[in-house]
Structures are given as C-alpha cells and as structure tokens.
Amino acid sequence: MQESLVETPANRYARQMALPGFGPAAQQRLAAARVLVIGAGGLGSSVIPALAAAGVGTIVIVDDDTVELSNLHRQHIHGVADVGRPKARSAAESVAGIDPAIAVEVHEVRLTAGNALELYAGVDLVIDGSDNFATRYLSNDAAALAGIPLVWGAVSQYAGQVGVAWAARGPQYRDLFPTPPPPGSVLSCEAGGVLPTVCSVIGSIMSTEAIKIITGIGAPLIGRVTTFDALTGGFRELSYERNPNCAPIDALIDYEVFCGTAPTVDSVTAPQLASELAAGGTVTLVDVREQWEADIASLPGSRLVPLGSLDDAIDGLRSAESVVIYCHLGARSARALDILRNNGFTSARQLDGGIDAWSRLVDPDVRRY
C-alpha cells in the first residue's frame, strides 16, 4: 500500500492537527463526539460530509424524507442514483465513502415532541438543518431539556443565518425569536427558492461552530447570529441576550399548534379529498403554484391560479360549490385561503401538505419535486 494511503490519524488529519491550538487533543475530542444532525437536505448535505471529513466519531442522522430530483441542485450529498431513496440512508453511505471508520446512526423518522428526547440521549451536540419553524423551536427546547448545545441555521433565497443556542452558557433560539412568524409570512425554499451556494456557506459555518464547541477552540456564536447575503457577498453579526420575558422550558409542547401550522377545520387531507372526488363530489381544485410547477405535476381537473394572480381570479370562483386550494407543501395555500376568506369564501379549504402529500398518500405516479 502506498504510504499516503496508510490509515492513521496522523496522516488523515495532519493539516487539521497542525492548526495553532488544535493538535492531537482536539482531534481526539472530535473522535469521541456524538453529533446529531436534523435533516439531510440543503444544510445537512453540507454539514454531514464536513463532520465526517473532520473526524467526528459518531454522526446520528434524523430525516424521514426521500431524495427528489429537484433536491440535487442544493443537496450535494445525494446523486441521481439516490432519487427515490431515503435521504438518511443516502447520507450515511456518503459518510462511508469519506471515512468508513466514522460510525453513523440512521433514523428515518421526523423529529417530534414524542421522540426528540430519546434521540437526544447520549448526544454531545445537535445541529438543526431543518426547514420549518416548528422543528426549530422543538430542537431548541429539546436541547435545553437535554442540557446540550444546539447549532441552528436557516436559508431562504439569497441569504442565510447561523446561531448557537446553549441554555447553560447563554441565550437560546427562543430569546431571539420568542414567537414564531405567522404561517406563510416567511418564504420557504419551496415558495421562494434558494441559491444552492447559500446552503453550502451556511452549512459550512454550522459545521465550524460544531467543531469549535466540541474541541473548545475559538468563540462559538453564543448570543450572536451571523447572517450572509449572497447578493452583496457580505456578512453581518447580530448580538442578543436572554429575554427575561421568556417562560422557562420545562416540557415539550405541540409545536405545529404553537407555530400555527397544525391542520385545521379549513384543511382536508389527501385521502379525504380523494374519497370526496371518488364519490362524485363537486370540488373546484385551485392550484396556486407557478406555471413551471404545474408543468411538473398537477391534480387532474385543477385550475392554475398563481398566488400573485388570485385577487384577479376571485370573481370567477364565486360560482364554485366547493373550493379546495393546493400548492406544493401548504405554505402558499394557507395564504391563499386567507385571501379567499377575506372575500367571503367561508367554506373554502386547503389541501393539507399540498400536492406532495397527494403524491405520498394517494397517487405515487404524481411526480414529486
């Protein structure tokens, strides 16, 4: 075997251990660490391989989603051959390709209030790469109860932000954001898009924060948030302190209800809608996505009215007996439902989970993206 391929920490991590203040001791702390990563999507795809390459001993991956073709532009840990496969498994295989000595635990589940504390048990640090506020508040609260640090990040369009929540050392996510924004008010990647390189930048900073906390080098982003604007190429830092008005965290709650994203009487599930249509129900389906999305997949018989054009189309919908609005995942349909409600459509409903839920729960032939 060539000398350069002989597997020892000294040659694999030589350039890392040569850093001032790092050395073998810091490398050993990385090797002994157990890090849980929530999400193997846009942020997780940068975080997971970075942790593996740095030598984190055990990586726990939590993700219940599957790889879609539209994920690949920003989720570089997956490839074309992985489309349709569980993201957590695909990510685990990528780790093995970087360093087969890294232990990987795969949990093909969604983080919930029911499983969070069990998943956090025995973990040294959590990295939250999720894409919704309910999971961010849950990950913060569970980390506070477990007494471990949380590195969180978020991206949207051309910008992103990173912070560290650590109840024992400083303020938490709730101190920065005491209450969640109204549903649909913050554009998700689904609704507003995201530049893939923003995911890479933010994911790299998240990984760096994790390495700093584990090894004890540098000053973690405790009480500080770093923001990145890709359009200007600039970084900014915001400082914040503990919020004395925040109630202490003593239990996990229903985070969908807290964030206003739980299904309501104004929602219909995909199986329920399928049953209504099969029974001959008179339902007017209104698709509030964009044309390019409808070109990928749409529900039969639906009418395309992009959200930005909904006000102009209201009069044409007044004769409909029953209106059901849908989008990709549900954010835009919630905003559309508010518009219709304000214009007298008291019985209008939205499809819970959007066309993505229809594909998963009713008709797998409808393409996911």
Which residues make up each language-model segment?
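Glycine-rich phosphate-binding loop and adjoining beta1-alpha1-beta2 segment
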Residues: 4-5, 61-99
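A short, aliphatic-rich alpha-helical micro-motif
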Residues: 30, 119-121, 317-318
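Residue-level detector of alpha-helix initiation sites
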Residues: 42-45, 50, 56, 66-67, ...
